From Swiss-Prot:
Pathway: Porphyrin-containing compound metabolism; heme O biosynthesis; heme O from protoheme: step 1/1. The keyword Iron does not apply. The gene is ctaB. InterPro entries: Protohaem_IX_farnesylTrfase, UbiA_prenyltransferase, UbiA_prenylTrfase_CS, UbiA_sf. Its main location: membrane. This is Protoheme IX farnesyltransferase. One of its GO terms (molecular function) is protoheme IX farnesyltransferase activity. Signal peptide: none annotated. The keyword Membrane applies. Carbon 2 of the heme B porphyrin ring is defined according to the Fischer nomenclature.
Amino acid sequence: MLWDYLILAKPEISSVVTLSAFAGFLIGSPTGLDGGTLLWTMLGTALCAGGVGTLNHVLERRYDAQMKRTAQRPLPAGRADPKMARRVGILLVCLAVGLLCPLVNVLTAVLAALTAVLYLFVYTPLKRTTKWNTLVGTVPGALPALGGYTAATGHLGAGGWATFGILATWQMPHFLSLAWMYRKDYARGDYAMLPVVEPDGNSTAAQMIGFAALLVPVSVLPVLTEAAGWIYGVGVVPLGLWFLWTTIVFHGERTGQKAKRVLKASVLYIPGLVALLLVDWFL
């Protein structure tokens, strides 16, 4: 039972969200880290991400039951109770905001609450109504990175918006590759994902390339705002070009295997970016 509720918290996604907040915190701390604030920020971000993930499972349980990829999740499979899952999700989000407000700062707590609201009540319903849902979803998806920056600085600065831009841009090829891989499943669940609405893949491939290409200059913004140094700048450009190359390969051969390669590159991109920030920070 406990394992099923852990699955509801989407630990893989929650870990990436928390890592993005860590990236924002590093960019907001060019001269020194406040260990205590960092700890509470990571905990609050993880709790919020887990709560939002759980509530998302509750909202989409009927549609998950229609899809092969998600039919065996705890709620559609009957291994977890929807009412209990709803309570757990709300509790986790409230705990996150309740921790961040007094122990980090009010602005970061507000961003966490805004992330939950936008993800659950804007992005989630849009997934079934418009092909632009992925683009809209980049906003709540990138807010935790901005929250990491505000946790370190207490304000919305150029470095924070640079971090937000990186995460927002990165999400498009990441989620479009996933949507392409499971487009038949999404069609069964009646989701209006771009590869479902436009099955030829032209727009999907073009957007993946476009946003991956945009990510290369956007990723350098922390250097231009003096929130990161030259080591990060030198490393993040080839990292972005490699990611871009996988999308170009997908454009030439729109198969599930090539889409999976884009997805893998996107999953490795964020840890790679954080590693570069750490090396840059320590050196």
